[in-house]
């Protein structure tokens, strides 16, 4: 993937950039692997906003991605590399020798015409999926399961990768992009390689309208609102809010205050955090 930068012909074009899409080989999805996707606009079943800053955007169709990679021993050919509006990564359409078609995340160095497979006997090359116990230490992987057979949960976005650093009994130790080292069951599957489209993070969107096309609405500061709309609202002239930062419902904002998760017991080393002085 490369990035094409625009000349400053308009204020919105100044500094903006776009992906060149040179790796894309087809401009329409496989019909049998597409489902309708209904926009919720951040509302729940009662019509109330539960997630702010969502709504609008271009209509999308959902591409069904194979995150389980459970078709063992059946080789597949990469028929196309396609664009997916629902994620930052590109997707690869696989044609299995038995006639089935599936989508997977397209890793780096996977091209149209390549062969991929999954299972214990698969080779260690980009796009192949194996249990962690069958992957050599030091290998870079993505699309990793947290529970055997549960489907990939870790390292699925563009440019994401995790390194297998050690194996100890029933667990494999993975180094996350954040620096965290976590134990994962060796029976869990992972795909060899790094997710493609790594330059995605370098795109300059240029104007608010491109964010609206993606379904992202503006984020308004609470101190710019009225008291009826936000706890920080109101006051004469410009104010600082007069209290510690809170969300519109009055709950503390900023640092997360999540309860302990059961999977935290599998963390070997925490990620490095910027500590306040």
Swiss-Prot record:
GO terms under biological process: cytoplasmic translation
Keywords for this protein: Ribonucleoprotein, Ribosomal protein, RNA-binding, rRNA-binding
One Pfam match: Ribosomal_L2_C
SMART domains: Ribosomal_L2, Ribosomal_L2_C
SUPFAM superfamilies named in the record: Nucleic acid-binding proteins, Translation proteins SH3-like domain
Domain of life: Bacteria
Segments of this protein annotated with the region Disordered: 37-58, 222-277
GO cellular component entries: large ribosomal subunit
GO molecular function, one term: structural constituent of ribosome
Biased composition (Basic residues): 268-277
Role description: One of the primary rRNA binding proteins. Required for association of the 30S and 50S subunits to form the 70S ribosome, for tRNA binding and peptide bond formation. It has been suggested to have peptidyltransferase activity; this is somewhat controversial. Makes several contacts with the 16S rRNA in the 70S ribosome.
Family: Belongs to the universal ribosomal protein uL2 family.
Subunit structure: Part of the 50S ribosomal subunit. Forms a bridge to the 30S subunit in the 70S ribosome.
Family annotation (NCBIfam families): rplB_bact
Protein name: Large ribosomal subunit protein uL2
Phylogenetic lineage: Bacteria, Bacillati, Actinomycetota, Actinomycetes, Frankiales
